[in-house]
Amino acid sequence: MNTGKPASNALAKAALLPDVARLAGVSTATVDRVLNRRPGVRPATVERVLKAAAELKYLPENDLYAALAPQPMRLTFLLPAGTNRFIRMMGDTVGYLHEHWAPYNVRCHVDYIESFNPEELAHSVLRAGERADGVAFMALEHPAVREAVNTLAERKVPTVTLISDISNTLRTAYVGLDNRAAGRTAAYLIGRFIGPRSSKTTAKVAMIAGSLSYRAHEEREAGFLQLFQEQFPGIEVVGLREGHDDARKNYEQTKVLLEQHPDLAGIYNIGGASDGVARAMEEAGCAHKVVFVGHGLSPDTRALLIRGSMDAVITQSPQTAMTSCVRIFTNVRDGLEPMGGVEVARSQVIFRENLP
């Protein structure tokens, strides 16, 4: 017959919880967070709570020593699956920088999820928040995603948006480029490559986007159009097509653009999978005639630069971006300003002649 001893112990612990809180000078909610090893409590407060628990014999001394040993912060990175090699490079970074991040005491995990699906992204953010102490992800502008971010904020689980930000949420920080400036940079490069036009002739330029549900892509488009209006009135933007960062779709969309505009002078790939764009240009025999600027230095875009099918790549360091995410999360864990000591993302423009 069950004597009820475990239940008695549970009652004793419940009765002692307010005593631990009083002795430590904190709330019972803080005690609960510490004893269940949830994030968001300053290290000094954690130590005070654990010592109070040991003094009141709420926590055996051996358990106290074990609890005082810092547990790794569990971090999840949610990245879109697909053929975007630069995104895959960011995920791979988590694996090979593991030892480099040892001083931060973190345990990182990468999940690849369906691209351009806001409901799936929102579900994945919430699911990750149940088991992780911090979640980083590429955001999509959608009410369901905003709600997921704010739900985790209420649970004291920090979130960091990576590459593409989201508006009107309680996300902790954004890691990535100034995307409006990136779009303006692309327009400037294409405008200069094309060169001056007479008042009677215009040059046609087109854009390929992953999806404008990415705020990053929307901002790049806005910056791109804005600079042409300001500085290159002789250049006409004739269209924007979405290829969902998929090489096959980008190939098909570029083929259509080239058929509709055989005199196309420039293409700006706002997102990834530039190899699909270049393949269509090469098949049409215009790879060395049409100015092509895109994003993300990867083995694919590197090869395109070398063979002259691509003119410039606007990129950022995947290692710096992922390390910045880790630093932000550990700052939050340690009660510091989230962006304290975090390196601001810087864009680089890579040509064939300055390949690193």
Predicted regions and their residues:
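Amphipathic helical "hinge" segments at domain boundaries
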Residues: 60-123
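Hinge/cleft segment of the Venus flytrap/periplasmic-binding protein
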Residues: 212, 228, 317-356
